[in-house]
Design a protein with these regions (language model features):
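Short alpha-helical
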Residues: 29, 39, 46, 107, ...
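Conserved HGGG/HGGXW glycine-rich cap/lid loop of the alpha/beta-hydrolase fold
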Residues: 23-67
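A generic "binding-loop/recognition-motif" signal
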Residues: 18, 27-28, 262
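Basic/polar N-terminal segments that are highly enriched at the extreme N-terminus
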Residues: 1-5, 287-288
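Catalytic histidine-centered segment of alpha/beta-hydrolase-like enzymes
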Residues: 262-271, 275
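Flexible "cap/lid" subdomain of the alpha/beta-hydrolase fold that forms the substrate-access gate
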Residues: 6-12, 20-23, 58, 65-100, ...
Length: 288
């Protein structure tokens, strides 16, 4: 599905943190997919399309992202986003989920797992922030640019000339040249819908701090939910060592799998391989 079709299917639900945008497909056990910085639930379009026969797949837009609407004073930190996920599940009357996270969304999933372990049926983490690697060294220039007030101009440049996006985010993609204009529009256009939407994204990035993940580390080390660690091996932001760190830190880890030459956004670029791992993980978790 393209971006227009994705947003046409989007629904919204009220939570104490704001009006949360989400898209869902399928029936059965709920899988909740959590994207990372700058993106939105569209990252998971291939998972929704291909895994809907395995369960009810829901891709949510985080606070300060996509079509989620919040107040100008709403906390948008990663811990606040973890609490929002719990509020979202409450509003949807969902008890437990198979949680899947990528990039900063994977860090948010770790915080959620630590704070709300009983709401996990299973956990799957792809290349993501962990421990004290937040923000990653290679992402710090972007964080500094945002802190200096450059986000609005950067987003405008990326939307006016999509090659700017492909160049800037090339390290996050295995094949950046294959990222179509519609995908870039779908990710970035909501962030410039108003000055407040751009400021919300600024606040999200400015709140990056490894204290959020370090703070919940002891609870994370008690998470027993069956956990899959799936990692692209060619990632300048999240080195392979972090997949090993997570596998050792989370006692529920059942499998760690490497995707050779893949980068952060391999769930978007290599969905067949990743979805096969998710299917197997969910099946094994349901029989645990």
């Amino acid at each position: 599905m393209n971006g227009k079709e994705f947003f046409a299917r989007q629904r919204h639900i009220e939570t104490p943190s704001g009006t949360i945008g989400y898209v869902e497909q399928g029936r059965g056990p709920v899988a909740l997919f959590v994207h990372g910085v700058l993106l939105n639930g569209y990252l998971w379009r291939h998972q929704l399309a291909q895994l809907g026969d395995s369960g009810r797949c829901i891709a949510v837009d985080l606070l300060a992202h996509g079509n989620t609407e919040i107040s100008a004073t709403q906390d948008v930190s990663v811990t606040a986003n973890a609490h929002m996920l719990a509020q979202f599940l409450d509003a949807m009357e969902i008890d437990q989920v198979d949680l899947v996270g990528n990039d900063s969304g994977g860090g948010i999933c770790q915080i959620f797992a630590a704070l709300y372990p009983k709401r996990l049926r299973s956990l799957a983490l792809t290349n993501c922030d962990a421990h004290d690697n937040w923000p990653p060294e290679a992402f710090k220039p972007f964080v500094a640019m945002v802190a200096a007030g450059g986000l609005a101009g950067t987003l405008s440049s990326m939307l006016a000339d999509k090659s700017v996006y492909r160049s800037a985010l090339a390290p996050a993609y295995e094949r950046p040249e294959d990222v179509v204009d519609d995908t870039i529009e779908t990710y970035l256009r909501p962030l410039v819908r108003s000055e407040q939407h751009t400021r919300n994204m600024e606040r999200f990035v400015n709140a990056f701090d490894c204290r959020h993940t370090v703070h919940i580390e002891e609870q994370l080390k008690r998470v027993q939910a069956p956990t899959l660690i799936a990692w692209g091996t060619d990632d300048i932001y999240f080195d392979l060592k972090w997949s090993l760190w997570l596998a050792n830190a989370i006692p529920g880890t059942r499998k760690r799998v490497e995707f050779a030459s893949a980068r952060i956004f391999f769930p978007e670029e290599r969905p067949q391989e990743f979805n096969a791992e998710l299917r197997a993980h969910w099946a094994a978790s349901s029989n645990a």
